């Protein structure tokens, strides 16, 4: 929309509007990814309509307005309002009065805003980039002041209309939520690694990492349908696989190959290394029921209709195998499990086929050497595509001294 707000769903060509606050934040991520894959920022000049106008505007203006909208969509303490839910659309009562805020969405906005600043600089729009930088600093200060739990050592999830904290160490239930900790790393916040350590201590189970803990045991009118589900089921403390996939990216960023392997094994339905899951061994699920569900533990919450598969694909290719698309080419910075001493992947990138072979010694996942068609190249340099050609790339992995 012209305001910068985006709808949640379009089905059969019809817009299905809902009062979820996070819809808009994903636009910048999508555009940034497409431009990096294509290597061509000219997409930003293409014009398209808003949903509520016949006049066309450049794609750049669309994402600028989306970032502006969320920054100005402020509730308590200047954080981003949660409205009728964020990514967790089952927290649908927390912000109906217009005051409740999502610490997670405020953190996610920081990542989107940083990407927008980069996009602005691609087009030489330095004033927009500087404004984004300044706003980013302001929002990060608010998050650290009003979204950090000093006692717990991690980030809160939300503050409701009546300023009831969700995801704080003094809460009786729902003391910690996973997604705030994950995105604090993705957004580059200063205490992200510390938050993740505390999150894993509390949330990890033999079949995956919980979305929240302890699960809510009774309905609460300031939360919503999350607290109406049985403890350990889906949003209410279940093993939700969207965040599990995000965690693969986070563990890769933090250079933790052992936890990457553990996370992959726990997500895959056929792997019983740490615990048994039930369901089709060839499908991805949205969640597993957590251990407190008793004999139902490991049962899928939903299969065949979930974004877990696409999130896992993105995390594995971009972060675990480390294939980072940049304007100049493909930068390789993996965090492979140490047991994967020999593996390979093929990626077609801008009409060029990259055949990439990884050779590890089991000591680490740092890139020690990189060669293209037998010629050594700097390990931290993007490899430019050659249209119509096949590049054979060898990556030597180990532990840097």
How would you label these PLM feature ranges?
Residues 1-7, 36-38, 50-79, 135-153, ...:
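Long, well-ordered core segments of solenoidal/helical folds
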Residues 201-202, 217, 229-234, 249-401:
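Non-catalytic C-terminal accessory modules of carbohydrate-active enzymes
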Residues 108-223, 265, 269-297, 348, ...:
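Catalytic cores of carbohydrate-active enzymes
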Residues 5-26, 51-57, 77-101, 152-177, ...:
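Carbohydrate-binding/catalytic loop surfaces
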Residues 17-20, 35, 60-61, 145-147, ...:
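A general structural signal for short secondary-structure junctions and capping/turn motifs
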Residues 38, 116, 120-123, 127, ...:
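Long alpha-helical scaffolds in large eukaryotic adaptor/regulatory proteins
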Residues 1-78, 102-110, 237-260, 264, ...:
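Aromatic-rich carbohydrate-recognition surfaces in CAZymes
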Residues 43-46, 151, 328:
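Structured alpha-helical bundle/scaffold domains in large eukaryotic membrane-trafficking regulators
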């Amino acid at each position: 929309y012209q305001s910068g707000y985006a709808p949640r769903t379009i089905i059969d060509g019809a817009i299905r509007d809902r009062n979820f606050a996070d819809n808009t934040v994903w636009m910048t991520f999508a555009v940034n990814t497409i431009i990096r894959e294509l290597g061509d920022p000219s997409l930003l000049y293409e014009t398209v309509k808003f949903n509520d106008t016949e006049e066309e505007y450049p794609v750049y203006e669309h994402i600028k307005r989306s970032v502006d909208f969320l920054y100005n969509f402020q509730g308590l303490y200047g954080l981003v309002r949660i409205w009728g839910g964020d990514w967790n659309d089952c927290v649908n009562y927390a912000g109906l009065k217009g005051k409740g805020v999502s610490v997670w969405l405020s953190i996610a906005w920081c990542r989107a805003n940083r990407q927008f600043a980069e996009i602005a600089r691609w087009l030489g729009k330095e004033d927009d980039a500087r404004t984004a930088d300044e706003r980013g600093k302001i929002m990060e200060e608010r998050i650290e002041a009003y979204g950090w739990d000093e006692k717990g050592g991690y980030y809160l999830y939300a503050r409701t209309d009546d300023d009831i904290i969700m995801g704080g160490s003094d809460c009786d239930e729902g003391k910690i939520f996973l997604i705030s900790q994950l995105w604090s790393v993705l957004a580059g916040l200063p205490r992200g690694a510390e938050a993740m350590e505390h999150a894993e201590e509390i949330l990890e189970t033999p079949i995956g990492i919980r979305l929240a803990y302890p699960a809510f045991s009774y309905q609460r009118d300031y939360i919503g349908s999350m607290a109406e589900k049985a403890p350990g089921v889906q949003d209410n403390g279940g093993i939700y696989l969207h965040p599990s996939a995000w965690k693969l990216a986070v563990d890769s960023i933090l250079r933790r190959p052992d936890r990457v392997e553990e996370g992959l094994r726990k997500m895959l339905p056929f792997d019983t290394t740490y615990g048994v899951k039930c369901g089709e061994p060839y499908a991805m699920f949205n969640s597993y029921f957590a251990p407190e569900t008793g004999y139902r533990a490991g049962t899928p919450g939903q299969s065949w209709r979930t974004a877990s598969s696409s999130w896992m694909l993105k995390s594995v290719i971009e972060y675990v195998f480390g294939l980072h698309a940049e304007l100049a080419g493909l930068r390789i910075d993996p965090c492979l499990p140490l047991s994967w001493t020999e593996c390979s992947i093929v990626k077609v990138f801008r009409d060029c086929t990259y055949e990439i072979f990884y050779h590890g010694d089991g000591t680490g996942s740092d890139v020690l050497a990189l060669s293209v068609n037998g010629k050594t190249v700097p390990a931290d340099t993007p490899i430019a595509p050659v249209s119509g050609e096949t590049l054979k790339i060898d990556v030597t992995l180990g532990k840097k001294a």
